[in-house]
Structure formats: C-alpha cells, structure tokens
Amino acid sequence: MQMKKCPKCGKYTLKEYCIDCNEKAGTVKPPRFSPVDKYGKYRRMLKKSLKK
C-alpha cells in the first residue's frame, strides 16, 4: 500500500482514484537520487541569483 496524491485537487489517499473528484491518483515518492545531477548546475545558478 502506497500513499498517493490526486493531481487535480491535491488530496492524499491510499486508493487508486481520489474519493472527492474521481481523478486517478499518482505516486508521491521523490525522484531517485543520482550522484550525476543533470540539473545541478542550473539549480545552483538559480539559488545564487535568488540570494542577491
């Protein structure tokens, strides 16, 4: 059993479909960690520009 989140209303459920809006719920697991970060350069640039 995995926790799922409705993409339409944002509510969490353990069922396949949301009980409120009957939309198919998706997984809420974060993406797998990889030491080869394809977007790390862009995240650091954004973080640096937001500090200013």
UniProtKB/Swiss-Prot annotation:
Pfam families: Nop10p
Keyword NAD: no
GO cellular component: ribonucleoprotein complex
InterPro entries registered for this protein in UniProt: H/ACA_rnp_Nop10, H/ACA_rnp_Nop10_sf, Nop10_arc-typ
SUPFAM superfamilies: Nop10-like SnoRNP
Keywords: Ribonucleoprotein, Ribosome biogenesis, rRNA processing
Signal peptide boundaries: none
GO biological process, one term: rRNA processing
GO MF, any single term: snoRNA binding
Keyword Metal-binding among record annotations: no
Function: Involved in ribosome biogenesis; more specifically in 18S rRNA pseudouridylation and in cleavage of pre-rRNA.
Annotated family: Belongs to the NOP10 family.
NCBIfam families on file: PRK13130.1
HAMAP family: Nop10 (MF_00803)
Protein name: Ribosome biogenesis protein Nop10
Gene: nop10
